[in-house]
Amino acid sequence: KRMEEIVKSQKKQLKNTISGQLAFELYDRYGFPLDLTQLIASENKLKIDIVEFDKCLNEQKNRSKIDAVKEYGDWIVLKQDDVQEFVGYDHSNAKIIITKYRSLFVKGKTKFQLIFNLTPFYPEGGGQVGDTGFIEDNQGMVQIKDTKKENGVIVHYVDELPKNLNSSFHGQVDLERRIKISKNHSATHLLHHALRDILGTHVEQKGSLVNENYLRFDFSHFSKLNPQELELIEQKVNNQIREANSLIEERNIPMEIAKKKGAIMLFGEKYGDSVRVIQFGKSIELCGGIHVSNSANIGNFKISSESSISSGIRRIEALCDKKADEVISNKLNEYEAISKLLKHPQELLSAVELLQSNNQSLQKKLDSCLLYTSDAADEVDSVD
């Protein structure tokens, strides 16, 4: 009934998109799965604002996480240190001390948050996931499970405390994981540039996710991308990778200078007076994330999917380096297997098309025979 009310209301107001908030209300309060809401909306020639729905869903998840934390302990100060330094742009390890810590009770388990005097661990932000790794002294090792920024301070999540909190530690980022993340992040910048170059400067970033496995990029565009456009975009990104452009990084430069350089800024994002600029060839963006030192380090780039997430917003997911190589290798293996089945024709596509044509012709003959048999059976029955 609530869905019917929403559909009628949207049509009455001459709107063609159901807000993500309303879709989330159906999901959260009435137990309506999103795909069912999308199906009913589609039947009524309506769309769903998926970006807003995802935002509502994430907010609920964050509230659930907060609710699951039954109690935060008070911050226990070990060392007075008003300024925490992030050294992760230049280093993946550092000698550190713990300045503060506190406990938190999550889903029946006690975990801990640590703050260091300085840190090589990148905190989640700008679409990039937080670093993991470990801290170690002569009494043992503690795994860093995640890194986030809270109230401007970088906080490290651990399942247990070191035996000696006052020790000096060696902090080490999971470098293999970070390298994979950096490849995907730099590829995201090249993808953004390729989209604006091929589709037009109306393209604006609307969201992103960068982790060690893949990259996801949401952007404004008015229509589904056709296979030719996707191929051009993929080629453009791979060409930029092969140009082997060295990273040009400028830190703490005035915003006005960044604007003059033509740096891309995210709509709605709040920037300070000083910003960090990341450049690979003609790709210039404001960014606080971790990147490769040269575009060639990204390896191959392969688009895995393109879809709509709301009216006027498209989403591309892609793979880099070894994961992209695996996809390409699998496709080639499939090609070889099909070619082998068809006795290695010189023109595989033509052979498949001929096979389809022959199959359709045989199907018509079979249908005709079945019809003839059926008619003959009817005649026999009538004689009887």
Task: Report each predicted region and the residues it spans.
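Residues immediately C-terminal
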Residues: 379
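A glycine- and charged-residue-rich anion-binding loop/surface
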Residues: 1-374, 382-384
